[in-house]
């Protein structure tokens, strides 16, 4: 019975389909077309032919002429099947490529970067994967359901009224049909007839994903359109268009642009014009643009009107054209004066200045130093508020620098040198020929003399017939003896001002060879030669092998020529260094070997090559045959070694560490498959970081071939370093300084960098937590070096994100030395000592952040996953210990918000609970004492901290904010009161109830107290609608009343004004935000209310960079000196934002000027924050702060007794991060103390050496910074660089040791007689711990380095003072000042006293207090010990 019924049903459906197409039965679309029912016109159904590709015409009777197209093209008709055109073979009729990226499993999107379980094609039946990460899911079209849209929806069961009462509903795949009784017609089955009794419900064609429909909207083809399931698109009948064929071609009423000055909106049957401001009429034809040639001042906005215009002024301006300033709009606009209304003045107000100030806004201090000869004898006049002081030149003292001092009294010249006074009474040593140095303490190599030991004694430099001595110098035995005020081989350099008296005459003598350019550099060397390419040396006398610096990028081959080099660039690249990629047009033959030309908006045009080909135009064939054989062999090796059985066991098996073996199941690659996105994954894994550029692997997916295609960084040449430093960031492009090594001339040649920060990089380290606590952030130095970026440990409100690891999950947080990590900032290259790997599964989990300075906007790393892949690839290639620590896993993960362990209370929690119980017991015992006391206890009204309960601690940490003040009402969950429970407890005080004897009132006095009540967890509340709208992108619609304006949301403790001020949405204009803020303040909003992070609306407005809102809030009484939980004021935050304009405005407030030296939680002033962050306006910001009263060398001394005091100045922070413009401003322009020690005894050059800041180290050395000073752990700057594997910086220090001393050491080693030990002079070691008996002032005094400067002054010690001092470990450094340096590597230069073995290990000659052990050793191999701090 069932089989006949089914047969009848299929017969019914087949007949119904035939009847349904109506007049298509008689239409002949030919063999090359398909007939479809078209749009219904009244009761008449039309039809149309859908032609196969290459055919057209009304009945598909015309065939396209292929002969008109190229070999790689095909001939097609347009969408109306009328016009012929040629497109590429893999393109649609509009010329758009049909090729889609073949994304790997788990990734999707146009660029295969979106990660989710349902990508790329898990969803079935037209479903689409949406979302990312844990939120990824399949969005199903109507008619399907299930996790993968694999289930058909039975519409007949879910909707009983799917068909009418007289018809029968029958379910089909994705849709359903309605069957009428025999003899009646659909849709209502009331009309009799003999045609089809079946109504087919059209299935969904495609799913539309948009901003308005993020979960998808089912789209159906209209007007007879045909759904092409292969492309999920509607093919429309002729005359119709649109994604669902919903539009008639003739219905586009806006096609003729009928609106003259407005926007045309088309609708069925007509259109409407939305006119621009100032225009009206049906077609916006009436009116004109009155804003043409308007007079509105810059910064204002012209608003067009019907007959005129008006100017919308910013808050600080007024007048018809915003040409006048409104002092009432900005508090304290008259900085040191009183604002007086003056309607007749040009500004509409006048400032009456206080004594000692001047300027339009009383912003300028009267500079007494403008008077001539205020300070005598080259003294420097320093202007002070209302006064001045004289900083005297060396050799003079007194208030006016008019008292000469005898500087030779304590100034001893060695080797028979004579001390003489210059005209400014500075002591100088006139050395005998053959000796140099500040005190003639260094002897030139045998046979050489002159001020740089660069003149041969047998030749000399002066004679009666030859060279002469200038400036009164006398020629004696071929050499010039100079008067005290001059130095140089020919007395050509003036000691006093550092200028050559001959100036241009020096270069007119043409001292430079090989067409080099001669320039005047500074006082030390007088002139310098800028060499042409291919030459080097002091006077460019030597040929240089330029190819040793690897200047060719992208696999270019370097060729050395006599005076230059050239690069043979691979196809697709050009430029002197093959650094530029050729641009091309997408033509027929652009891409070879089957490649397809794709035009991408962001990346430009490129060829997407067929498999097996690479190159810019797919011209290179990849040798896949050879590698396929190798890969096949490796796969068989993996099978023979049973790698699959040993995979994923937690141990890296080196014999299975191949891409073909999946890197031992991830055991050797941090549990990742780093080359999973790479098209040639196994091949590129083999080529990774092998030193040879492979273009097929030089892309983001293949991790840029391990950076093999990047050029080497060339150092700034020694002889032009000072030249480039003096011209750094001066606004003029100096091409010779426009290199990476020279800092790109400070951006003067438009070479700028943008910093990006990537977070949530999680690594698991097989190391005991105790050992990781000791090593701290230094364990990550090698990662920074290998990835070519800055790597830091990520942190939250509780500190560094480092957790214990039990082999399966994260446990307790590891307490790190936050101060040490903060000081490091940039974690450097490697750990030199062997790391002991944990024998068990115990380890640590560390969350990292990466900061990359992207050249010209091109970053190596797009997201955290790309960083993780690079780490994993290096682990697989170099070993899991390749970063100095054993990394067993690397992945992208968000830090957990709870810091407690998962199975038991931590010892810290137990101790806290125990301490709390002890406090309770003590107080209870006190309350039980006899009540015969007559004196009342003094009660202090202070909050008492209570150790949190276990559940409370979990709740608090689960709901805390990781980033302070960055809250949102648009989060997925909204929890009312849980977040701030600990802070709520701080408002309670714990007192015992009166017990035993005595009067409770006597015990408590008259104090009104509240017994401790631990708040219970309330039910979650819904977000406040007014707050949600304030935080959104559109205008507030909820009424702002006196009652609603100060309602506080329980989660973030914010009012509506907080949410308005923190709104940084680009879609919400600042005009609207200011307007809403005005409404709130008019309704009685508290402008100084603080949220849970103690941020006021003003602070949030500064964070959001809303300058106009900040101006209005301050006018309304907002206090800029309120500090948040990070102990930052609005000025601190403006400095952290690098917002120069906001800082200018903030410093107009006299309130903030008094707090300009205040420290934030990190112990930094606003000037220190500016110095610590690079940026375009940072020097201008620093100058502004100094002009407003910030002290250059302020170290936070006012807060010496607080934990945040570090004793550092702005120069420390600038040197630590290599902020060279700030370093040069502080040292070069403001004379900042170069040798100031912080609390750990570190000077700026020590921090720079420790962090690998080579440019800072060179500059500070040139400026005379001490290199022999030691920190609190008795380490010099060289030792800090050595311990952190910054060998290039160690090399800089070692270059300063002359060949003479090296030869003497070798001579001593060959001598068999014991020598007397050398005297060791060391700067005193600063105490690392303080005695309780010491006063705070003694322990935290800011001190200069000792011994004192050689010249007797209190400024920076002279480096020459330390030239004969040594250290016990390692070998002492001997420093030559820039005045006497010679180019390293030249035939006449001093050679470093160090070398390198083949394995990179350094050797040194020992400089010990005893040479007895070395008598029989011609050379001692010496490995420098590692140091950890």
UniProtKB/Swiss-Prot annotation:
Polar residues composition bias: residue spans: 1361-1374
InterPro entries attached to this UniProt entry? Ankyrin_rpt, Ankyrin_rpt-contain_sf, EGF-like_Ca-bd_dom, EGF-like_CS, EGF-like_dom, EGF-type_Asp/Asn_hydroxyl_site, EGF_Ca-bd_CS, EGF_extracell
LNR repeat start and end residues? 638-674, 678-709, 716-754
* S-S bonds: 24-35, 29-49, 51-60, 118-129, 123-138, 140-149, 156-169, 163-178, 180-189, 205-227, 221-234, 236-245, 254-264, 259-273, 275-284, 291-302, 296-311, 313-322, 327-339, 334-351, 353-362, 369-381, 375-390, 392-401, 408-419, 413-429, 431-440, 462-475, 469-480, 482-491, 507-518, 512-529, 531-540, 547-558, 552-567, 569-578, 586-597, 591-607, 609-618, 638-661, 643-656, 652-668, 678-702, 684-697, 693-709, 716-742, 724-737, 733-749
- Where are ANK repeat segments found? 1093-1122, 1126-1158, 1162-1194, 1206-1236, 1240-1269
What SUPFAM superfamilies does the record point to? Ankyrin repeat, EGF/Laminin, Growth factor receptor domain, Notch domain
Query: Sugar-bearing residues?
Result: 41, 165, 194, 378, 515, 623, 751, 754, 900
The UniProt entry, under CDD domains, shows: EGF_CA
Cite a single Pfam family from the UniProt record.
Ank_2
Basic residues bias spans: 1319-1330
- Highest rank taxon of the organism: Eukaryota
| Sorted UniProt keywords | Activator, ANK repeat, Cell membrane, Developmental protein, Differentiation, Disulfide bond, EGF-like domain, Glycoprotein, Membrane, Notch signaling pathway, Nucleus, Repeat, Signal, Transcription, Transcription regulation, Transmembrane, Transmembrane helix
**What segment(s) does the record annotate as region RAM domain?**
933-952
Similarity-based family: Belongs to the NOTCH family.
Q: Which PANTHER family match?
A: CRUMBS FAMILY MEMBER, DROSOPHILA CRUMBS HOMOLOG
Q: What is this protein called?
A: Protein lin-12
């Amino acid at each position: 019975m069932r089989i006949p019924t089914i047969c009848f049903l299929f017969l019914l459906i087949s007949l119904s389909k035939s009847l349904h197409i109506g007049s298509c039965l008689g239409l002949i679309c030919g063999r090359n077309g398909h007939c479809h029912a078209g749009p219904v016109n009244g009761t008449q159904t039309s039809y149309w032919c859908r032609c196969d590709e290459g055919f057209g015409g009304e009945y598909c009777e015309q065939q396209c002429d292929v002969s008109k197209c190229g070999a790689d093209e095909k001939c097609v008709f347009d969408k109306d099947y009328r016009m012929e055109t040629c497109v590429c073979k893999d393109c649609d009729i509009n010329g758009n490529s049909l090729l889609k990226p073949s994304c790997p499993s788990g990734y999707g999107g146009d660029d295969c970067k979106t990660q989710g379980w349902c990508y790329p094609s898990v969803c079935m039946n037209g479903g689409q994967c949406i979302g990312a990460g844990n939120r990824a899911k399949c969005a199903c079209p109507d008619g399907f359901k299930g996790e993968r849209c694999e289930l058909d929806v039975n519409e007949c069961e879910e909707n009983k009224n799917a068909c009418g009462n007289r018809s029968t509903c029958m379910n089909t795949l994705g849709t359903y049909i309605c069957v009428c009784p025999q003899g009646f017609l659909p849709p209502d089955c009331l009309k009799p007839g003999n045609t089809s009794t079946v109504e087919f419900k059209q299935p969904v064609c495609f799913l539309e994903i948009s901003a308005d429909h993020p979960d998808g909207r089912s789209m159906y083809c209209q007007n007879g359109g045909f759904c092409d399931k292969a492309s999920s698109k509607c093919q429309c009948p002729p005359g119709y268009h649109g994604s669902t064929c919903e539009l008639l071609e003739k219905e586009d009423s806006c096609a003729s642009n009928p609106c003259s000055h407005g926007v045309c909106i088309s609708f069925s049957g007509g259109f409407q014009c939305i006119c621009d401001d100032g225009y009206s009429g049906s077609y916006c034809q009436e009116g004109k643009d009155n804003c043409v040639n308007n007079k509105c001042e810059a910064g204002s906005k012209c608003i067009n009107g019907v007959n005129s215009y008006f100017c919308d002024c910013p808050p600080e301006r007024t007048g018809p054209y915003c040409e006048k300033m409104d002092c009432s709009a900005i508090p304290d606009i008259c900085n040191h004066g009183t604002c007086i209304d003056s309607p007749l003045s040009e500004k509409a107000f006048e400032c009456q200045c206080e004594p000692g100030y001047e300027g339009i806004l009383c912003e300028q201090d009267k500079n007494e130093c403008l008077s001539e000869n205020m300070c005598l004898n080259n003294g420097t006049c320093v202007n002070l508020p209302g006064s001045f002081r004289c900083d005297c030149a060396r050799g003079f003292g007194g208030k006016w620098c008019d008292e000469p001092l005898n500087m030779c009294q304590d100034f001893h010249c060695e080797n028979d040198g004579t001390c003489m006074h210059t005209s400014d009474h500075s002591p100088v040593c006139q050395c005998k020929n053959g000796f140099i140095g500040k005190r003639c303490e260094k002897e030139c190599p045998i046979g050489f003399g002159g001020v740089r030991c660069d003149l041969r004694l047998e030749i000399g430099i002066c004679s009666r017939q030859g060279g002469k001595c200038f400036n009164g110098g006398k020629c004696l035995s071929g050499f010039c003896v100079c008067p005290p005020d001059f130095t140089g081989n020919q007395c050509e350099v003036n000691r006093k001002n550092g200028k050559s008296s001959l100036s241009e005459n020096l270069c007119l003598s043409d001292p430079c060879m090989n067409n080099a350019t001669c320039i005047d550099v500074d006082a030390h060397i007088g002139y310098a030669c800028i060499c042409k390419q291919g030459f080097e040396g002091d006077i460019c006398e030597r040929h240089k092998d330029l190819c040793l610096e690897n200047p060719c990028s992208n696999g270019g081959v370097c060729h050395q020529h006599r005076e230059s080099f050239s690069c043979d660039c691979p196809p697709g690249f050009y430029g002197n260094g093959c650094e530029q990629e050729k641009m091309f047009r997408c033509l027929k033959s652009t891409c070879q070997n089957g490649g397809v030309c794709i035009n991408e908006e962001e990346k430009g045009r490129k060829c997407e090559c067929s498999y097996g080909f690479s190159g810019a135009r797919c011209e290179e064939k990849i040798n896949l045959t050879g590698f396929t054989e190798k890969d096949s062999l490796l796969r068989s090796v993996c099978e023979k070694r049973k790698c699959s059985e040993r995979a994923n066991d937690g141990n890296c098996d080196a014999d299975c560490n191949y891409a073909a073996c999946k890197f031992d199941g991830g055991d050797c690659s941090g549990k990742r498959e780093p080359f999973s996105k790479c098209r040639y994954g196994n091949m590129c894994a083999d080529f990774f970081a092998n030193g040879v550029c492979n273009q097929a692997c030089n892309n983001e997916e293949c991790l840029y071939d391990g950076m093999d295609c990047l050029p080497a960084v060339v150092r700034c040449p020694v002889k032009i370093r000072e030249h480039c430093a003096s011209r750094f960031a001066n606004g003029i492009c100096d091409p010779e300084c426009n290199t990476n090594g020279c800092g790109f001339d400070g951006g003067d040649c438009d070479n700028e960098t943008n910093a990006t920060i990537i977070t949530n990089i999680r690594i698991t380290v097989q190391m005991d937590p105790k050992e990781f606590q000791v090593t701290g952030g230094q364990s990550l130095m090698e990662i920074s070096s290998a990835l070519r970026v800055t790597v830091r440990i990520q942190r939250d409100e509780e500190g560094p994100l480092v957790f214990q690891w039990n082999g399966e999950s994260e446990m307790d947080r590891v307490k790190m030395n936050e101060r040490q990590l903060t000081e490091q900032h940039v974690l450097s290259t490697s750990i030199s000592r062997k790391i002991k790997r944990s024998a068990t599964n115990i380890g640590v989990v560390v969350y990292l952040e990466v900061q990359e300075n992207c050249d010209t906007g091109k970053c190596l790393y797009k997201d955290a996953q790309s960083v993780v892949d690079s780490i994993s690839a290096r682990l697989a290639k170099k070993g899991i210990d390749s970063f100095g620590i054993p990394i067993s896993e690397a992945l992208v993960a968000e830090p957990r918000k709870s810091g407690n362990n998962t199975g038991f209370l931590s010892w810290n929690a137990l101790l806290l609970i125990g301490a709390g119980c002890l406090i309770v017991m003590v107080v209870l015992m006190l309350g039980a004492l006899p009540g015969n006391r007559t004196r009342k206890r003094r009660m202090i009204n202070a909050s008492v901290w209570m150790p949190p309960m276990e559940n409370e601690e979990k709740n608090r940490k689960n709901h805390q904010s990781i980033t302070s003040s960055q809250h949102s009402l648009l989060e997925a969950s909204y929890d009312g009161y849980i977040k701030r429970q600990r802070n709520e407890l701080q408002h309670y005080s714990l007192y015992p109830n009166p017990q035993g004897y005595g009067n409770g009132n006597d015990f408590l006095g008259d104090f009104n107290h509240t017994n401790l009540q631990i708040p219970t967890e309330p039910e979650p509340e819904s977000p406040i609608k007014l707050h949600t709208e304030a935080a959104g992108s559109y205008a507030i619609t909820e009424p702002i009343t006196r009652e609603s304006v100060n309602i506080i949301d329980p989660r973030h403790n914010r009012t509506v004004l907080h949410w308005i001020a923190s709104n940084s949405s680009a879609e919400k204009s600042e005009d609207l935000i200011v307007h809403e803020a005005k409404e709130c303040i008019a309704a009685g909003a508290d402008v100084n209310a603080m949220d849970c992070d103690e941020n006021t609306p003003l602070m949030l407005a500064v964070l959001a960079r809303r300058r106009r809102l900040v101006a209005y809030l301050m006018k309304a009484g907002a206090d800029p000196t309120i500090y948040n939980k990070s102990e930052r004021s609005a000025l601190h935050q403006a400095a952290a934002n690098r917002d120069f304009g906001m800082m200018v405005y903030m410093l107009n407030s006299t309130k903030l000027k008094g707090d300009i030296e205040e420290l934030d939680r990190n112990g930094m002033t606003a000037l220190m924050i500016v110095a610590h962050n690079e940026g375009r306006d940072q020097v201008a910001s620093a100058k502004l702060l100094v002009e407003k009263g910030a002290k250059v060398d302020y170290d936070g001394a006012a807060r010496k007794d607080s934990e945040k005091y570090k004793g550092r100045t702005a120069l420390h922070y600038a040197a630590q991060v290599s902020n060279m413009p700030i370093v040069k401003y502080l040292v070069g322009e403001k004379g900042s103390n170069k040798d100031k020690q912080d609390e750990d005894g570190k000077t700026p050059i020590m921090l720079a050496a420790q962090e690998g800041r080579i440019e800072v180290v060179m500059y500070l050395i040139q400026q005379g910074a001490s290199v022999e000073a030691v920190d609190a752990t008795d380490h010099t700057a060289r030792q800090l660089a050595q311990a952190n594997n910054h060998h290039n910086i160690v090399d800089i220090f070692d270059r300063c040791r002359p060949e003479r001393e090296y030869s003497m050491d070798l001579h001593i080693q060959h001598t068999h007689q014991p020598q007397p030990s050398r005297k060791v002079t060391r700067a005193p070691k600063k105490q690392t711990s303080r005695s309780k008996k010491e006063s705070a002032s003694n322990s935290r005094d800011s001190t200069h380095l000792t011994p004192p400067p050689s010249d007797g002054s209190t400024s920076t010690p002279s480096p020459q003072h330390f030239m004969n001092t040594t250290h016990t470990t390692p070998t002492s450094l001997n420093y030559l000042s820039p005045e006497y340096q010679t180019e390293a590597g030249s035939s006449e230069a001093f050679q470093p006293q160090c070398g390198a073995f083949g394995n990179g290990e350094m050797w040194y000659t020992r400089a010990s207090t005893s040479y007895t052990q070395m008598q029989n050793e011609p050379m001692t191999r010496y490995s420098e010990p590692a140091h950890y701090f």
